């Protein structure tokens, strides 16, 4: 009961990012961990002690299963506490979270090995085959008292946390990987996916959560961090297969409908995606956090369609209702309002952005404040607000979801901007638009101009490194320019620092270089 309540508390915190809910989740998780701490002794060692004392093995079985379950819960609590720590995005929080994960890793690894050993012993007992030399010890006695269902449930329980752990570590920004390696645990993406898949098909209570974690990874993480390089639809087949298998079991689930919308958005079926998100919004009538996630996607899909009025309505509601990053929502609201032509109303909201700036170490809020500062002092133009909307679509990897007619309209809107302070940004966005349109030669030219534009360092410091990354990725597509492409990727990673969304770009560069190593072994 305690773990279930603390997990709900954790989910609530992660969906709202409200400070008081995050603190409550930490307290609840620590309480649950303390309840289980007294049972943290090693499972196999405990069994040996019981056997030595001539205690009937069958009587020890419930205790053994209970101890394994408690250890898994402790590790789960550690992972969730680490995640809550990482959300703060401070160096001290990363270090603290890393040490917490170290403890979780040791427990997961031991439980995983113990459960696999018990499953092997159980199978050999059933088939009455002689034990291997590795398993030939007194522990095989207890396998007789463990049911296959209990072992399967335990394997499902540990696989959820074990899989999520591997997946999260495999996506750590490269500049933090050295710290992770020093702590002594690896991150294996394929192992993570395999474990989560096992957990999703198990009878453990976290099976639905494992399914949602897989859908989140395939429809949110993979496209956002460009883990599949220029393939913007990587992971969609896996996500659709999961929905096909599970949809009948959860016909009225707002979350499953939400992920259906994510798949449709990534397939550029924006109208269908909007229908799914609106349906999910209605299904989540009593679930405020899920409603906000749906509203966020409705706002983004509306921006993708250049329907700034509907986008404004969604983001304004989020600004007023959500406690997570009101500063960011205010910026998006102002951008969309200005893009409709209401520049005076937009300026009033741009002035609110600074007042709503609360999370000083949050990159998204820092970006929002810097961008709003200019329009706080002078009335924005509609053209600059449209450019700002295209900018966030680019930074959040949403341009590949746009239709060809809308991309062409965006290209025209960029050309209409006549402001010397945003020349580098304009060229970066034009390069990205032409890349989506399939005009590689034009894209290369615009990216080259953006990469050479020194004037953007003051107002848009991220433009040059992002342009180097984009240019490098394009050059990787041709055998004769692969070496130059790799050089540009390394340049984007090593020659720039202190710009907006630096970690985000490092993850994308890391993924691009990793895919290159797979094609051309070093």
Curated annotation (Swiss-Prot):
TPR repeats lie at residues 254-287, 292-325, 424-457. The gene is Ttc39c. Pfam families: Iml2-TPR_39. InterPro entries: Iml2/TPR_39, TPR-like_helical_dom_sf. The keyword Repeat applies. Belongs to the TTC39 family. It comes from Rattus norvegicus. GO terms for biological process: cilium assembly; otolith morphogenesis. Keywords: Repeat, TPR repeat. Signal peptide: none annotated. This is Tetratricopeptide repeat protein 39C. The keyword Repeat applies.
């Amino acid at each position: 009961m305690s773990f279930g309540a603390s997990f709900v508390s954790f989910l609530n915190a992660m969906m709202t990012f409200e400070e008081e809910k995050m603190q409550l989740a930490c307290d609840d998780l620590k309480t649950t961990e303390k309840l289980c701490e007294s049972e943290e002794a090693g499972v196999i060692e405990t069994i040996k002690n019981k056997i030595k004392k001539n205690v009937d093995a069958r009587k020890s079985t419930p205790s053994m299963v209970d101890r394994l379950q408690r250890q898994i819960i402790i590790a789960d609590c550690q992972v969730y506490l680490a995640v809550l720590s990482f959300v703060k995005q401070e160096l001290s929080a990363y270090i603290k979270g890393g040490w917490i994960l170290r403890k979780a890793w040791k427990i997961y690894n031991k439980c995983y090995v113990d459960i696999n050993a018990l499953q092997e012993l159980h199978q050999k007992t059933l088939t009455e085959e002689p034990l291997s030399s590795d398993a030939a010890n007194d522990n095989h006695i207890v396998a007789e008292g463990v049911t296959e269902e209990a072992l399967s449930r335990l394997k499902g329980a540990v696989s959820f946390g074990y899989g999520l752990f591997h997946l999260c570590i495999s996506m750590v920004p490269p500049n933090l990987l050295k710290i992770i390696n020093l702590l002594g645990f690896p991150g294996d993406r394929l192992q993570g996916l395999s474990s989560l898949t096992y957990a999703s098909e198990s009878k453990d209570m976290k099976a639905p959560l494992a399914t949602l974690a897989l859908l989140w990874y395939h429809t949110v993480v993979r496209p956002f961090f460009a883990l599949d390089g220029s393939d913007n639809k990587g992971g969609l087949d896996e996500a659709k297969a999961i929905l096909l298998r599970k949809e009948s079991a959860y016909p009225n689930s707002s979350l499953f409908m939400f992920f259906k919308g994510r798949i449709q958005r990534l397939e550029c079926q924006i109208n269908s995606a909007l229908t799914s998100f609106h349906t999910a919004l209605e299904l989540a009538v009593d679930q405020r956090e899920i409603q906000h996630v749906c509203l966020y996607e409705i706002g983004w899909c509306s921006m993708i369609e250049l329907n700034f009025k509907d986008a404004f309505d969604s983001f304004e509601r989020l600004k007023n209702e959500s406690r997570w990053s009101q500063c960011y929502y205010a910026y998006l609201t102002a951008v969309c309002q200005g893009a409709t032509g209401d520049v005076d109303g937009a300026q009033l909201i741009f002035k609110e952005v600074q007042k709503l700036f609360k999370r000083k170490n949050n990159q998204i809020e820092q970006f929002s404040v810097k961008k709003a500062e200019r329009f706080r002092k002078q009335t924005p133009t509609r053209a600059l607000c449209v450019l700002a909307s295209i900018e966030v679509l680019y930074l959040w990897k949403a341009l590949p979801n746009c239709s060809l007619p809308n991309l062409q309209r965006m290209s025209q809107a960029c050309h209409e901007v006549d402001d010397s302070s945003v020349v580098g940004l304009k060229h970066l966005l034009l390069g990205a638009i032409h890349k989506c349109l399939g005009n590689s030669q034009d894209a290369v030219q615009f990216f080259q101009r953006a990469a050479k534009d020194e004037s953007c360092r003051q107002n848009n410091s991220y433009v040059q490194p992002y342009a180097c990354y984009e240019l490098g990725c394009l050059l990787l597509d041709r055998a004769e320019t692969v070496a130059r492409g790799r050089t540009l990727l390394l340049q984007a990673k090593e020659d720039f620092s202190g710009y907006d969304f630096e970690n985000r770009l490092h993850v994308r560069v890391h993924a691009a270089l990793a895919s290159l190593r797979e094609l051309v072994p070093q």
